[in-house]
Design a protein with these regions (language model features):
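A C-terminal-region feature
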Residues: 1-139
Length: 139
């Protein structure tokens, strides 16, 4: 987690329209320096993609994106995203990390600036992490 005065030891290299972020690990996310991680909007956790930058680029250009994004595609998504500004991402309600069994078709969505979404994700992740650690404290 990043807090005021700390440096995030990873380099954000991409984001996606569903609100996920891709990062090159600089030590923040695991021991695999140079590994690529995905901040998943459905878990609010960094997940290793078990690849490095060149593998990520190959996947982004030639990989099975339909499989990767199958849970965040809705009827008409392609046409809707074609009109979208590249500085925006979708924010879903209920959030994707809540009610995970709920289809994306049944969620409302709006576009928001990617930097606001990044800040929101970090804040939510921080709050959830603090709640979990508070649960571990003795009464």
């Amino acid at each position: 987690l990043v807090t005021a005065g700390q440096t995030f030891q990873a380099l954000l290299i991409a984001d996606d329209a569903s609100g996920g972020f891709f990062a090159l690990n600089g030590g923040e996310l695991g021991k695999d320096l140079g590994g690529i991680y995905y901040f998943a909007p459905d878990t609010l956790e960094w997940e290793s993609l078990d690849t490095h930058y060149s593998g990520f680029m190959h996947w982004a250009l030639c990989g099975d994106l339909d499989l990767f994004y199958k849970n965040v595609r809705w009827t008409g998504w392609r046409e809707e995203m074609a009109l979208m500004n590249c500085n925006l991402v979708y924010s879903f309600y209920p959030f994707l990390w809540t009610e995970q069994q709920l289809s994306v078709e049944k969620r409302s969505r709006v576009t928001i600036p990617v930097e606001k979404h990044w800040a929101l994700c970090l804040d939510l992740q921080h709050q959830l992490t603090n709640m979990q650690s508070d649960d571990l404290l003795p009464p």
